Regions:
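Helix-start (N-cap) detector for alpha-helical repeat units in TPR-like alpha-solenoids
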Residues: 468-469, 502-503, 536, 546, ...
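Polytopic membrane enzymes that build or remodel cell-surface glycoconjugates and lipids
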Residues: 1-519, 526-533, 544-546, 551, ...
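Terminal, low-structured helical/coil segments at or just beyond the last alpha-helical repeat
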Residues: 645-676
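TPR/Sel1-like alpha-solenoid repeat signature
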Residues: 471-478, 490, 504-515, 524, ...
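Conserved structural position within tetratricopeptide repeats
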Residues: 462, 493-496, 529-530, 537, ...
Length: 676
C-alpha cells in the first residue's frame, strides 16, 4: 500500500468514526447556559455584562464562547479579532482570559456567515479539518519520522491517530475545533522542516507554525518538534553534513521561536488569576506540589494509553490530591518518570551509538530514533500545559492532548507493528483489527456523549463523581430548561461535595429567586458572599462580590425592605467603585439605588443616583444603559418638580437624536405640567 493510499484511508476512517459528531448540539464551552446569561445591552437594570456568573461549569465566567462571542456572531470589525481574546473580550480588559486565537475566531466567523448560528455547519467544518489533519499526520510519519516507511506500520499509526477516543473533545465540540485547525498547520510546519534550507525554507516552516499558533497557542511548538526530529534523523543517518545542517536549522528555529514567544507574551496584559477550583494541583502545599504535578502528567499519559474513562471536566475533586510523598500514587509517578528517563536514555544511545541507518540495509531502521521522535511529538506540544512557567486554568483537559497523541500513536504503531511481525501470520490481522475496533467503538460512544448537554454532563458525573463542577453544569442546564427540582437536587449534591463553594450557594439563590422563595434566596446569596474569601482576592471575585450585593439588594427590595436594600446597593457601589472591570456593576448599583429611593418618594436623591449611573455608563461605553439611566434621572427630576433641570437634559438628548420618541414624550409631559 502506497503512502497516498494510507493517507486517504486514515482520512476516510476518521470521517466515518466521527460522523455521528455532526449531529451534536452546541455544548459546554460552545455556549453558556448558566443563570447569569451573557453580556448584552438592556433597557432595564439587569445582571452586568462583565461577570457572566455561573456558566455551564458552575464557575464565574468572564468570557463568551462561540454562540455568544460578538466577534463570531456580530459584524464587529475584523481588526477586533486581533485585539480580543478567544472569547471576545479585549485583551486589555482586566477580566480577559488572555487566550489569543484570532484565526480560530475568524474560522468560526466564516462558518457563521456561510451557515448561520446552527451547530451542524460548525461541526462539519471541524470534521473536515480533522480528516485533513489525519492525512497530514500519515504524511509526517512517511516523510519525516520513518526512514523506512513500511506501508503496514504507516497505516497502523494513521488509524490509531484517526480513531483515538481522546480526540472526541476536540472534534465533537465546536470550541475544540481550534485544536484541530491548529494541528493542520502544525503538521505542515513539521513536514517542511527536513527540507528547509536557507531563508526561504525556514520562513515557510515558521509561517506555518505562526499560523498554527494563531489558531491555538500550542501550534508554535511545531518549530521545536520539527527541529528536534530533524536532528534525530540526521544523527541516525550518520552524515556529518546533515548533522551540521540540522544544527543550523535548529538554532535558527530556536531564535524565531523565542522571538515569536516574546511577542506573544507581550500581547498578554496580565496573566489570569486561577484558584484551586480550576487547578487543584497548582495550589497543593509546597512540598507536595511537584508530586501532584507529576501525577497529573501520569494521569494524562493514562488517558492517552487507556482512554476508557473520559470527562469534559477533570477539575475540583476529580483527581484527589496527593497528601503524602509515601502514597502509592506518588511512588508510581516517580517510578514512571524514572522508567521514561531510562527508555529515553537508551533510545538516545541507540541513535548515537549504533551503525548509521544508511549502512544497515532496507528495513533496518533505528528504533531509538523513531521512539525519541514520538517522545518529541508527545512531550513538546504538552509543555505549555505543564504549569512550568505559569499556572494554567485546568487540571486535565483532554483537548490539549490532541497534538501529544500523535507522539503516542507513532510509538504505539511502531511497537505494535514490530510485535505483530513476530506473531503467527493467522493471528496478526485479527489482533490488530480487534484493537482498532475497540478504539472505534469507544470513539463512537464518546461522540454520542457530546451530542447534548444532558448526555455530556451525565457522562462526566459517571466518570468523575466527586467533581462538583459537573453537577453544577447539569444543574444549570436543568434550571435553564425550567426543571427547578432537578436543578436544586444537583446543586445540593454539589454543595455536599464542596460545602464552601460560593458558586453553588449563588446558583441556589438564583433558583429560589425564580421560584419566588425570597427568604431562601436571600439566605443563599448571603451564604455565597460569606463563603468566597479565596476567590474575592481575584478580579473575578471582586466583580462577583459587587454583583452579590446587588442581588441581595434586589431580593430585599422585592421583600419590601427598602432600607436594607439601600444598604446592599451602597455596598455594591463601594465594592465596584474605581475598578473598570466592575463598571457594569457600578452602574447597576447606582440605578438600583435610584429605583428604591424613587419608591420611597425621595426623588431628588433618586435623580442623583440615576445621574451617577449615567456618568459611569457613558464613561465606559455602556451606551444603552447610559441612555436608560438618563431617562430615569429625567423622570425623577420631573417627579421632584425640578422641571428646568429635566428640560435641560431632554434638550441634550434631542440635540443628539432629534427623533428620540421617548424624549419627545417627556417633553410633551413637561408642557402639560406647565399648562396645568
Amino acid at each position: 500500500m502506497g503512502g497516498r493510499r494510507a493517507e486517504a484511508l486514515a482520512a476516510g476512517v476518521a470521517l466515518a468514526a466521527f460522523a455521528n459528531a455532526l449531529r451534536g448540539d452546541f455544548v459546554f464551552d460552545d455556549f453558556r447556559c448558566g443563570p447569569g446569561g451573557g453580556p448584552r445591552e438592556e433597557t432595564k437594570p439587569r445582571p452586568p455584562p462583565g461577570p457572566g456568573l455561573t456558566g455551564p461549569d458552575g464557575r464565574l465566567r468572564l468570557r463568551r464562547a462561540v454562540v455568544e462571542n460578538p466577534d463570531v456572531v456580530k459584524a464587529t470589525p475584523l481588526a477586533d479579532l486581533f485585539r480580543n481574546d478567544f472569547w471576545g473580550t479585549p485583551l486589555a480588559s482586566p477580566v480577559s482570559h488572555q487566550s489569543y486565537r484570532p484565526l480560530a475566531v475568524l474560522a468560526f466567523r466564516a462558518v457563521f456567515r456561510l451557515g448561520g448560528l446552527r451547530p451542524e455547519p460548525f461541526h462539519a467544518a471541524v470534521w473536515a479539518a480533522y480528516a485533513v489533519s489525519c492525512a497530514l499526520f500519515v504524511r509526517v510519519c512517511r516523510r519525516v519520522v520513518f526512514a523506512d516507511p513500511a506501508p503496514g506500520r504507516l497505516l497502523l499509526c494513521g488509524l490509531l491517530f484517526a480513531l483515538h477516543p481522546v480526540h472526541c473533545e476536540a472534534v465533537a465540540s465546536v470550541v475544540g475545533g481550534a485544536e484541530v485547525f491548529a494541528s493542520v498547520f502544525f503538521f505542515l510546519s513539521v513536514l517542511a522542516s527536513p527540507a528547509a534550507a536557507g531563508v526561504g525554507g525556514l520562513a515557510r516552516c515558521c509561517a506555518y507554525a505562526v499560523v498554527a499558533m494563531l489558531f491555538k497557542e500550542q501550534g508554535i511548538m511545531a518549530l521545536p518538534v520539527g527541529a528536534a526530529v530533524r536532528l534525530l534523523r540526521a544523527a541516525a543517518g550518520g552524515r556529518r553534513a546533515e548533522v551540521v545542517a540540522g544544527v543550523k536549522y535548529a538554532a535558527a528555529a530556536a531564535a524565531v521561536f523565542l522571538a515569536v514567544l516574546a511577542c506573544r507574551v507581550g500581547l498578554a496584559r496580565h496573566f489570569p488569576t486561577w484558584t484551586r477550583h480550576e487547578n487543584p494541583a497548582a495550589f497543593a502545599p509546597d512540598g507536595l506540589r511537584a508530586w501532584n504535578h507529576l501525577y497529573i502528567y501520569l494521569f494524562n499519559l493514562r488517558l492517552l494509553i487507556l482512554p476508557a474513562t473520559l470527562s469534559c471536566d477533570w477539575g475540583m475533586g476529580s483527581i484527589p490530591l496527593i497528601s503524602r510523598a509515601s502514597e502509592p500514587r506518588a511512588l508510581a509517578s516517580a517510578l514512571a518518570l524514572l522508567l521514561a528517563a531510562a527508555v529515553a536514555a537508551l533510545s538516545l544511545a541507540a541513535v548515537c551509538g549504533r551503525r548509521p541507518e544508511g549502512r544497515r540495509g532496507k528495513g533496518k531502521e533505528n528504533l531509538g530514533c523513531v521512539l525519541l521522535a514520538g517522545v518529541c511529538f508527545a512531550v513538546l506540544p504538552f509543555l505549555p500545559s505543564m504549569n512550568l512557567l505559569v499556572v494554567v486554568g485546568f487540571a486535565v483537559a483532554e483537548r490539549v492532548l490532541f497534538l501529544p497523541s500523535a507522539g503516542l500513536c507513532i510509538i504505539a504503531g511502531t511497537l505494535l507493528h514490530r510485535l505483530a511481525g513476530r506473531a503467527p501470520r493467522h493471528a496478526k490481522l485479527p489482533l490488530v483489527t480487534f484493537l482498532l475496533a475497540l478504539l472505534a467503538a469507544r470513539t463512537v460512544a464518546r461522540n454520542r456523549a457530546w451530542r447534548s448537554a444532558e448526555s455530556l454532563f451525565g457522562a462526566a458525573i459517571a466518570a468523575a463523581p466527586r467533581n462538583e463542577k459537573v453537577y453544577a453544569m447539569l444543574g444549570d442546564k436543568h434550571m435553564k430548561d425550567g426543571a427547578l427540582d432537578r436543578a436544586e437536587g444537583l446543586f445540593k449534591a454539589a454543595l455536599a461535595l464542596e460545602p464552601g463553594d460560593f458558586k453553588m450557594h449563588y446558583s441556589l439563590g438564583v433558583l429560589y429567586q425564580q421560584r419566588g422563595a425570597l427568604d431562601a434566596s436571600l439566605a443563599a446569596f448571603r451564604g455565597a458572599l460569606a463563603t468566597g474569601p479565596e476567590f474575592s482576592a481575584t478580579i473575578n471575585g471582586r466583580v462577583f462580590a459587587a454583583h452579590l450585593h446587588n442581588k441581595i439588594g434586589d431580593v430585599q427590595s422585592r421583600m419590601g425592605r427598602p432600607d436594607a436594600a439601600l444598604e446592599s446597593f451602597d455596598a455594591a457601589v463601594a465594592a465596584a467603585a474605581g475598578d473598570a472591570a466592575q463598571a457594569a456593576e457600578l452602574v447597576l448599583g447606582h440605578a438600583n439605588r435610584g429605583a428604591v429611593l424613587g419608591g420611597l418618594g425621595r426623588w431628588g436623591k433618586s435623580a442623583g443616583a440615576h445621574e451617577a449611573a449615567y456618568k459611569v455608563a457613558g464613561a465606559h461605553g455602556l451606551h444603552g444603559r447610559a441612555l436608560e439611566a438618563l431617562f430615569a434621572a429625567i423622570e425623577a427630576l420631573v417627579a421632584a418638580g425640578r422641571h428646568a433641570a429635566a428640560r435641560e437634559r431632554i434638550e441634550a438628548v434631542l440635540r443628539a437624536d432629534p427623533r428620540n420618541a421617548r424624549s419627545r414624550a417627556l417633553e410633551g409631559r413637561l408642557l402639560r405640567l406647565a399648562d396645568g
